[in-house]
Amino acid sequence: MSYAYQRFYRGPIEAVIFDWAGTTYDFGSMAPIRAFQNLFAEQEIPITLAEAREPMGTEKREHITRILNMPRVREAWREKYGALASEADIERLYHAFVPMQIEAIRECARPVPGLMETVAWLERRNIKIGANTGYNRDMLDVLTDIAAAQGYRPASNVCATDVPKGRPYPHMSLKNALELGVGDVRACIKVDDTLPGIEEGLAAGMWTVGVTTSGNEVGLSQEDWTALDSASKTVLREQAQERFRRGGAHVIIGSVADLPAAVEYIERWLAQGHGPDTTGLAGVTLTAAGVSLR
């Protein structure tokens, strides 16, 4: 004889695991961009905004490696230095990058509008809060100190250098879940503004929420975003939404201010016996009012 059974988690959301830059702090994820562009400018190989943003979400040494492997940058480096970038070059660049990144973090460390209201909403529902990042520990310590002084204190903070592999591997989110004491990964939501961050959450077996307006996929500072006309905002927002749909995000929101609607939507799915791996649930777009724009 053989037996098979299927378990469904039908309980509430227990934890939300946030990304940092572009999701909860630093609207537009500008600090990494400043640091990467400054780093390559010092090498006399300027990189574009698009080149700096493409690997966003990955661990920063890996981010540098991926930029160096871009065809245009690879050939520019060969022309400038007579050979392709070596492991020693990558290590040198990374050590030069760290202080640049820390300085940029200090300059850009402001909460995304709506963060504290959303945190208060989560706390009222006894939902635990964790966070992870592609920053290393020195970078993260600077950011968490600033955030704590402003009232944002995730109970678990994990950085890419704390685990064997960063995004898109699930290690950081799983470490967050362990530290938060979560009973089932299906009771967790990973919130991120990058596609590697969404892949991380999916690989961890969690629900995922993609963030468009405040994050890397739109890629504008708050001031530049505010200055756009409504038609331009719609185009950029819809382009970002489509990338998150293709990347498998379960729910897509504009910013952390919209997260309560996403949590309630996911809890309705859970009550119906659905899980993060249920076919056909990805790609729902929500507003703060909870209206589905799918």
UniProtKB/Swiss-Prot annotation:
GO terms for cellular component: cytosol. One of its GO terms (biological process) is organic phosphonate catabolic process. Gene3D superfamilies: HAD superfamily/HAD-like (3.40.50.1000), Putative phosphatase, domain 2 (1.10.150.240). Transmembrane segments: none annotated. Involved in phosphonate degradation. Belongs to the HAD-like hydrolase superfamily. PhnX family. Homodimer. This is Phosphonoacetaldehyde hydrolase. The gene is phnX.
